[in-house]
């Protein structure tokens, strides 16, 4: 056991985590040169296309160190985006140490800080690594000082390496082996294994990635899932050397995968503890804190026949992505679907794309909203995650909106622009610290504003240099109203939005203008209105298409023309009474584009 090292690689987006993982795999000979590919751990198509890591992946490698000992390295490559920070905290729970990778050109960014503090809170040893020193813009000395100044870790002798060219990667591994402690745990105690991740395989059922804290587990053992009390038989057990390799047992301190023929998707929830069925452990391991989704949106299959397969797909996906939340909902406009909760907009986009690709579904998404806490006049408090669930205004005592605490790191020259942006988003400044040329800003901004397009706007006002990390702070009373959209006098529940009273007229006006672009013209006038309660605040009309009925009159009598026009008018009127308006998918997402192109 003293030769096992479990560690994660944490860093900001694009600081080179996945490339460093590739090099470590190559040096330890996990894959032959023929099987080696760039970003070998980003196995999902989506990850490769977007060039980001979404799922944390684990690998077990053997490394012969300079002192002649053979070490077993279990490492987990983690995502860098703030939407997937939950994946990071899960990976860290399985480790004793973490490699903090910092780009020697970019320096410390907000995610570096956030992930690093998560690691320190979990009592992990953090080893700083300066990556990308082959770049002409690299300034390792300045960045080392920055790490010390902002993060507070001694980085004077941090390993300098370049994952792309492979310089210094061996030193990184040597440093790891020296500094990260061996796992603790008792090989003879009753089995306790933490489930780090699960996914669904069509042939094997549920496959779980586990980290053994105490005891050991063999192929053929009977194990018990502690939260459900179900007993299963272990069919296969093994490790990843990125490839799945079968072994006969996993011992204390190791990370590997097990297949126990669990068919039920909720059979082995992530964060649960596995123990031996014969002599079970007394108490489960401390799991992970459940994450609360920040953004909710309705997802509906385009054809109602897909509802069943959509439900199965969501089940399989939520097994793999523990932060996804869903419950059935029905809408008068869109039929049956699900209300899903996500950690952020990127997460929502990824989930929607995975559903469409991996499960072949056609989906319509409604615009995302955040959760509001509503106090009723009778003293009840309810949580509202969709505008259609908001009670009537006369029953509401107070609506409280979620406030996010946003930490931003940015170069001084963009400070003015960023502050203007935060004020526009109804933000309140709570802290500002200068670190050399960098400024660290803390703002309290309503979650609804952060979630919508704050990240994109922040990047564009600061030319991509600012970085953001946010977390939920509290609920705070605010003057919020629901803006309904009426099409030809009928309310469309899927288009309603909750917004601040001051922004409502402007938001409503912009929304109806946007909708006008997306709704195709019909044979009759379509009135699009935005209303608060019964009070109409904005209207626009999609003009009808009409045939020129006077074309065949040559000169002629005015009463003849009047007759034809009158006849056409009556026809249009009749049409309008029975006509339906088909809304394209873009119309539902028009809300997202409100306030975008300023």
Swiss-Prot record:
Q: What is its main location?
A: membrane
Q: Which Gene3D superfamilies match?
A: 3.30.70.240, Elongation factor 4, C-terminal domain, Elongation Factor G (Translational Gtpase), domain 3, P-loop containing nucleotide triphosphate hydrolases, Translation factors
The protein's topology relative to the membrane is:
Peripheral membrane protein
Residue ranges of every copy of the tr-type G domain listed in the record: 2-184
For this UniProt record, give its keywords in alphabetical order, as a comma-separated list.
Cell inner membrane, Cell membrane, GTP-binding, Hydrolase, Membrane, Nucleotide-binding, Protein biosynthesis
Stretches of the chain forming a coiled coil according to its record: none
Which SUPFAM superfamilies does the record cross-reference, listed alphabetically? EF-G C-terminal domain-like, P-loop containing nucleoside triphosphate hydrolases
The UniProt entry's GO biological process terms, in alphabetical order, are: positive regulation of translation
Q: Which reaction does it catalyse?
A: GTP + H2O = GDP + phosphate + H(+)
Where is it located? Cell inner membrane
A GO cellular component annotation here is: plasma membrane
**One GO MF term:** GTPase activity
E.C. no:
3.6.5.n1
The keyword Hydrolase appears for this protein? yes
Q: What InterPro entries does the entry give?
A: EF-4, EFG_III/V, EFG_V-like, EFTu-like_2, G_TR_CS, LepA_C_sf, LepA_CTD, LepA_IV
Amino acids binding GTP: 14-19, 131-134
According to its UniProt record, what is one Pfam family this protein matches? GTP_EFTU
Q: What does this protein do?
A: Required for accurate and efficient protein synthesis under certain stress conditions. May act as a fidelity factor of the translation reaction, by catalyzing a one-codon backward translocation of tRNAs on improperly translocated ribosomes. Back-translocation proceeds from a post-translocation (POST) complex to a pre-translocation (PRE) complex, thus giving elongation factor G a second chance to translocate the tRNAs correctly. Binds to ribosomes in a GTP-dependent manner.
Name the PANTHER family on file.
TRANSLATION FACTOR GUF1 HOMOLOG, CHLOROPLASTIC, TRANSLATION FACTOR GUF1-RELATED
Q: Which family does it belong to?
A: Belongs to the TRAFAC class translation factor GTPase superfamily. Classic translation factor GTPase family. LepA subfamily.
Please name the NCBIfam families in this protein's record.
lepA, small_GTP
User: Could you identify this protein by its name?
Assistant: Elongation factor 4
Species per Swiss-Prot/TrEMBL record: Proteus mirabilis (strain HI4320)
């Amino acid at each position: 056991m003293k030769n096992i090292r479990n560690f994660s690689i944490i860093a900001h987006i694009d600081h080179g985590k996945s490339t460093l993982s590739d090099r470590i795999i190559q040096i330890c000979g996990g894959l032959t040169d023929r099987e080696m590919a760039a970003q070998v751990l980003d196995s999902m198509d989506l990850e490769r296309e977007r060039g980001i890591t979404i799922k944390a992946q684990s690998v077990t490698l053997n490394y012969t160190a300079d002192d002649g000992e053979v070490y077993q390295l279990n490492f987990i490559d983690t995502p860098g985006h703030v939407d997937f920070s939950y994946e990071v905290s899960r990976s860290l729970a399985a480790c004793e140490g973490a490699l903090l990778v910092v780009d020697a050109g970019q320096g410390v960014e907000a995610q570096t800080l956030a992930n690093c503090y998560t690691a320190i809170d979990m009592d992990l040893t953090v080893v700083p690594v300066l990556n990308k020193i082959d770049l002409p813009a690299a300034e390792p000395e300045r960045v080392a000082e920055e790490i010390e100044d902002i993060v507070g870790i001694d980085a004077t002798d941090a390993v300098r390496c370049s994952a792309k060219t492979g310089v210094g990667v061996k030193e990184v591994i040597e440093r790891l082996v020296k500094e990260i402690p061996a796992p603790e745990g008792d090989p003879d105690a009753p089995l306790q294994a933490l489930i780090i991740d699960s996914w669904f395989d069509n042939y094997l059922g549920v496959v779980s990635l586990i980290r053994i804290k105490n005891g050991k587990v063999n192929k053929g053992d009977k194990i018990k899932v502690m939260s459900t009390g179900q007993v299963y038989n272990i069919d296969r057990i093994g490790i990843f050397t990125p490839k799945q390799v079968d072994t006969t047992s996993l011992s204390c301190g190791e990370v590997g995968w097990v297949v126990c023929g669990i068919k039920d998707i909720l059979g082995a929830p992530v964060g649960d503890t596995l123990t031996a069925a014969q002599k079970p452990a007394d108490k489960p391991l401390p799991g992970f804190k459940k994450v609360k989704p920040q953004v909710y949106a309705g997802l509906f299959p385009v054809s109602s026949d897909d509802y069943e397969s959509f439900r199965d797909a969501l089940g399989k996906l939520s097994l793999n992505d523990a932060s996804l939340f869903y419950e059935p909902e029905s809408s008068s406009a869109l039929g049956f679907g699900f209300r899903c909760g996500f950690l952020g907009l990127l997460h929502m986009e990824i989930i929607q794309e995975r559903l469409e690709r991996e499960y072949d579904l056609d989906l319509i998404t409604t615009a995302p909203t955040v959760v509001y806490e509503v106090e009723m006049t009778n003293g009840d408090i309810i949580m509202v995650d969709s505008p259609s669930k908001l009670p009537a205004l006369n029953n509401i005592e107070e609506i409280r909106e979620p406030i996010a605490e946003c930490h931003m790191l940015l170069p001084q020259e963009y400070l003015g622009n960023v502050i203007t942006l935060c004020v526009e988003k109804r933000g309140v400044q709570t802290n500002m610290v200068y670190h050399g040329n960098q400024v660290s800003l803390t703002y309290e901004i309503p979650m609804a504003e952060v979630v919508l397009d704050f990240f994109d706007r922040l990047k564009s006002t600061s030319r991509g240099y600012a970085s953001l990390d946010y977390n939920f702070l509290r609920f705070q009373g605010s003057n919020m109203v629901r803006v309904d959209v009426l099409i030809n006098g009928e309310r469309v529940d899927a288009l309603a939005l909750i917004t601040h009273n001051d922004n409502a007229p402007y938001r409503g006006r912009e929304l109806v203008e946007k909708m006008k672009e997306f709704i195709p013209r019909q044979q009759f006038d379509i009135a699009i209105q935005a209303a608060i309660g019964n009070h109409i605040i904005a209207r626009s009309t999609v003009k009808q298409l009409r045939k020129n009925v006077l074309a065949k009159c040559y000169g002629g009598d005015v009463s003849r023309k009047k007759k034809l026009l009158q006849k056409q008018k009556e026809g249009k009127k009749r049409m309008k009474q029975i006509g339906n308006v088909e809304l394209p998918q873009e119309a539902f997402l028009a809300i997202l584009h409100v306030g975008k192109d300023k």
